């Protein structure tokens, strides 16, 4: 309760102020009159409650929602059970289960890997939110399976766990792959097991006398499959013969290789890929990265032809160089990549070469696997008998083009179009397409476009025409993404606009010269200055 004296004093002050004439302050100085038409009403801008502060608890900080197992594909073998991964615990609260395993489906004969009826595809383990990815169970067949290799122990310095081991597939003799540690060591590859003798390891290279660096060791072949030993690769910089890579029997594509892919087995071997490759690579190539012929001097990249094989192998499947069964793209000046023939008893179809990219619709030379129709631009798929004579080189023509639709700046151009804004032709874009389709960043392939909008990850990247639509899923991907990543508050898109209330003295939208720049705040400041000057 206020003191009576204070109350009387306040009343007296109000009375004195009321007795002053209009436009006159207490010390006698003139004040700038404020017309009633320019006086802003004292309105309070009430902003709605912050969206992030009252977020839906059902999506706050949870893991990826669980997916039902893949129904599989019809066949003649037994269905493989898809393992279910443990629930994700990423976030402040335990969320629903991680991705469910993909089951093989009844008799999902994954023929084509030497297939035949009854070769089921084992289930894929689910993926937890972080950090581990369970192993791949391999391919089941008629021979004993390889035991799963022990997972790596991770790295004590980084504190990250290793990857679990991957088991081999029965019948195929694929060896077990050891887990990959977080850093820095990688486990070895044990070779391929089968019924035939192992190939001797090729001699390691001797290095290069000019560089002073040692060469790489030779690799031995695997038993039964008849892969020859791989010779070591020199440190680079020297003679064309420094690359000690004997190649595969029947494979005539690379210089320094002998034979090709005619692998000893239970059925007649495949012949060499046709047409036969030239003895040397053409010297023409991209500036600064030419592929010299086998007899030429080191090119501008400082490597001889044999040492350039490593670069060629790294590039040939992204469409930047090579030659083979598919003609090169018109106008690119670069050759295509070589074709691969199948091996006996495995039923691998031949791989067509990939052109350098950029030109005609036929530049995409990867015919795929017969019976497998999941990837765009591929024909045929995996309906290959495994015990019958080997498959020849794949011959079905590819689809005319990839769908032109894609993210702005990273579109998948058609095979007949010019290089897109990402600077790559359709053939080179295949690499990007394959890399993206399993992480949900494109609508092509086996992952539906609505993947982003169901799970909110990866974050939606707006295109030139604005953010992509919700696709009718009823799920707010942006809200989920913000909650999932940060778990903090996400301001409402209307809160900022609502907090700035318009006033009567606002400058008109037309921005005319007659608009007044005087504001109540400026008038008050002028009055204060005038009062101070008068007091002096």
Swiss-Prot record:
Indicate whether Thylakoid appears among the record's keywords. no
Q: Which residues form the signal peptide?
A: 1-19
**Pathway(s) the chain acts in:** Secondary metabolite biosynthesis; terpenoid biosynthesis
Biased composition of type Gly residues is found at 209-220
Q: Which residue windows does the record flag with biased composition (Low complexity)? A: 195-208, 287-302, 408-423
Which GO biological-process labels does this protein carry?
terpenoid biosynthetic process
Q: Which domain of life is it from?
A: Eukaryota
Per UniProt, the keywords (alphabetical) are: Signal
Which portions of the sequence form the region Disordered? 141-164, 185-220, 261-302, 385-423, 491-536
Function, as annotated: Part of the gene cluster that mediates the biosynthesis of calidodehydroaustin, a fungal meroterpenoid. The first step of the pathway is the synthesis of 3,5-dimethylorsellinic acid by the polyketide synthase ausA. 3,5-dimethylorsellinic acid is then prenylated by the polyprenyl transferase ausN. Further epoxidation by the FAD-dependent monooxygenase ausM and cyclization by the probable terpene cyclase ausL lead to the formation of protoaustinoid A.
Task: Tell me what else is known.
Answer: In A.calidoustus, the austinoid gene cluster lies on a contiguous DNA region, while clusters from E.nidulans and P.brasilianum are split in their respective genomes. Genetic rearrangements provoked variability among the clusters and E.nidulans produces the least number of austionoid derivatives with the end products austinol and dehydroaustinol, while P.brasilianum can produce until acetoxydehydroaustin, and A.calidoustus produces the highest number of identified derivatives.
Per its record, how is this protein called by name?
Austinoid biosynthesis cluster protein W
What species is this protein from? Aspergillus calidoustus
């Amino acid at each position: 309760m206020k003191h009576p004296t204070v109350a009387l004093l306040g009343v007296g002050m109000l009375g004195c102020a009321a007795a002053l004439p209009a436009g006159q302050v207490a010390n006698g100085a003139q004040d700038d009159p404020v017309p009633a038409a320019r006086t802003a009403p004292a309105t309070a801008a009430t902003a709605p409650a912050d969206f992030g502060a009252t977020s839906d608890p059902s999506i706050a900080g949870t893991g990826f929602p669980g997916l039902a197992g893949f129904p599989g594909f019809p066949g003649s073998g037994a269905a493989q059970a898809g393992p279910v991964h443990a629930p994700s615990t990423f976030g402040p609260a335990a969320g629903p289960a991680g991705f469910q395993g993909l089951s093989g489906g009844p008799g999902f004969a994954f023929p084509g890997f030497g297939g035949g009826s009854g070769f089921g595809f084992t289930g894929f383990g689910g993926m937890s939110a972080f950090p581990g990815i369970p192993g791949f169970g391999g391919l089941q067949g008629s021979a004993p399976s390889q035991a799963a290799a022990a997972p790596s122990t991770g790295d004590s310095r980084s504190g990250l766990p290793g990857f679990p081991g991957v088991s081999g597939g029965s019948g195929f003799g694929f060896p077990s792959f050891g887990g990959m540690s977080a850093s820095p060591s990688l486990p070895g590859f044990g070779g391929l097991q089968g019924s035939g003798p192992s190939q001797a390891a090729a001699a390691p290279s001797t290095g290069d006398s000019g560089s002073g660096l040692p060469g790489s060791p030779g690799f031995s072949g695997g038993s039964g499959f008849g892969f020859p030993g791989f010779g070591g690769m020199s440190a680079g910089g020297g003679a064309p013969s420094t690359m000690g890579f004997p190649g595969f029997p029947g494979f005539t594509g690379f210089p320094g290789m002998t034979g090709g892919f005619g692998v000893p087995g239970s059925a007649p071997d495949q012949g060499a890929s046709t047409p036969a490759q030239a003895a040397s690579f053409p010297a023409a190539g991209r500036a600064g990265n030419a592929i010299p012929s086998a007899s030429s001097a080191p090119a501008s990249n400082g490597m001889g032809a044999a040492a350039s094989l490593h670069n060629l192998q790294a590039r040939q499947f992204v469409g930047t160089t090579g030659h083979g069964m598919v003609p090169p793209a018109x106008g690119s000046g670069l050759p295509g990549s070589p074709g691969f023939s199948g091996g006996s008893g495995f039923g691998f179809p031949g791989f067509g070469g990939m052109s350098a990219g950029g030109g005609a619709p036929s530049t995409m030379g990867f015919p795929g696997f017969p019976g497998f129709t999941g990837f765009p631009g591929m024909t045929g798929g995996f309906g290959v008998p495994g015990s019958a004579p080997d498959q020849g080189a794949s011959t079905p023509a590819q689809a005319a083009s990839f769908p032109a639709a894609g993210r702005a700046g990273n579109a998948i151009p058609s095979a007949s179009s010019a290089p897109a804004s990402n600077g790559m032709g359709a053939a080179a874009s295949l690499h990007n397409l394959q890399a993206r389709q399993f992480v949900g960043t494109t609508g092509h392939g086996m992952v539906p476009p609505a993947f982003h909008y169901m799970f909110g990850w990866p974050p939606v990247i707006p295109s030139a025409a604005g953010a992509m639509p919700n696709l009718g899923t009823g799920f707010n991907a942006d809200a989920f993404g913000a909650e999932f990543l940060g778990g903090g508050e996400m301001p409402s898109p209307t809160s900022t606009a609502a907090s700035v209330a318009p006033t009567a003295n606002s400058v008109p939208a037309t921005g005319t010269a007659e608009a007044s720049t005087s504001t109540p705040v400026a008038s008050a400041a002028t009055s204060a200055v005038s009062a101070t000057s008068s007091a002096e």
